[in-house]
Amino acid sequence: TTDINTDIKNQVYFNITNKCPCRCTFLIRNTEDAIGEASNLWFEHEPALEEIYKAIDEFDFSDCNEVVFCGYGEPTMALENLIAVSKYIRERYPFRIRLNTNGLSDLIHKSSTAEEICQAVDSISISLNMPDAASYNEVVRPAYGEKSF
């Protein structure tokens, strides 16, 4: 079984995809199948929206104050699901919604995605892993090369 949601310190993390346009050298996904209480964060297949809804409906959110889109893939690779799941959560719970991202959504989708992302989440954490393009490319290894920085 693969964990779609994992509870860590009053935050529920939603792992909605394993796809990512980067091959970061430092990520735990390179050495571990899971973190925290999760048993496995690698999907046998990318979860359908109905599977994510089912995981939400079956999860105990009683200690939660924030949900975070973050996992073993870049959440914006599954942008349609991210937006739909955010709406689904907002209709049911009063939680803040945060996106942890590599910031490459516009490159991934070949268009501006900021407006729809900002309507779906309350806050965004962008990984700025290195101070310059050369070291960023060496460590993050993005599919889009230097324009990723």
Where are these regions (language model features)?
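Short, basic/glycine-rich phosphate-binding loops at helix/coil junctions
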Residues: 31-37, 63-67, 132-135
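Soluble or luminal CAZymes and related metallo-dependent hydrolases
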Residues: 44-51, 81, 147-148
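Conserved AdoMet/S-adenosylmethionine-binding subsite of the radical SAM
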Residues: 57, 72-149
